[in-house]
């Protein structure tokens, strides 16, 4: 420690946020050269970060920022290993700088972010330095950066626990309706945060996915019906289809004729068929689009009015406001979705760190 002053140690600590003993060791290793000591600590920090990187980061935050004019919005998922660190002021500052960098460089993917400059160095280098200082693996996992063309707005909602965030984009024609469209987008975002639709529209499903889900759905309903029969309760209809994408014009025409043939066989006069068939068709479509009702935003029943789907709510607003509204963007992030946290014995984890 000869020749290493307390002032030099303090200066290095102020520059790097590293621990006092680490700063002393670094200065001794490089004979008091401040720049080399900074490099030494950076290398040491990166080394620690690399060891931490094989630990699962499944806590953290979902953070979003909507522009005041509702013409753009950003959302990011940043993972940490523990909820405690996610509440750390240093972690909050990292989240803030991440959003600032995304905005400044028009970033749309994590790969772009890591290469982008922040304070004259790559963001990736800044991230590694924060991993070393905070002491946990930190991962910028997802980024959404939406920009609205003319006659579109974007609004969003982040749950107060910072574990769920949603962005919604809506197209409209009448500018005087913009404030109401902004509010509608936020309400729909709140719905999506709670109800977890996987996609915006059934058109986003593959036919293979729908067929697989329909088989599982039928098995589920048959099981429910066994219990309902035992209890003497009404049975649910067994669907033939699961999604609107399967209900082609030919399928609907065939079903309509089947209903008409049924009414004819019952001796119902043809002049009243038009009053009966539409209701039967509506029920047929409802029974055969259960996957849409569960997994699509437009097909779900609105939490604020459970007699209408989101699609119907948007259509009703269009009519009421003399406009032509359409949801064009839907992005939902849920913290740690798809990640499984490692269940490790704490003593074993400490032992691994000591290696």
Curated annotation (Swiss-Prot):
Q: Which UniProt keywords apply?
A: Cytoplasm, Elongation factor, Protein biosynthesis
What does this chain do? Associates with the EF-Tu.GDP complex and induces the exchange of GDP to GTP. It remains bound to the aminoacyl-tRNA.EF-Tu.GTP complex up to the GTP hydrolysis stage on the ribosome.
Q: Which CDD domains match?
A: UBA_EF-Ts
Q: Which InterPro entries match?
A: EF-Ts_dimer_sf, Transl_elong_EFTs/EF1B, Transl_elong_EFTs/EF1B_dimer, Transl_elong_Ts_CS, UBA-like_sf
The answer to keyword Cytoplasm applying to this record is yes
Q: Where are the transmembrane segments?
A: none
- Look up the domain of life of the source: Bacteria
Q: Name one Pfam family in it.
A: EF_TS
What's the family?
A: Belongs to the EF-Ts family.
Q: Where is this region: Involved in Mg(2+) ion dislocation from EF-Tu?
A: 82-85
Recorded protein name is Elongation factor Ts
Is the Cell membrane keyword given for this protein? Answer: no
Give the record's GO CC terms.
cytoplasm
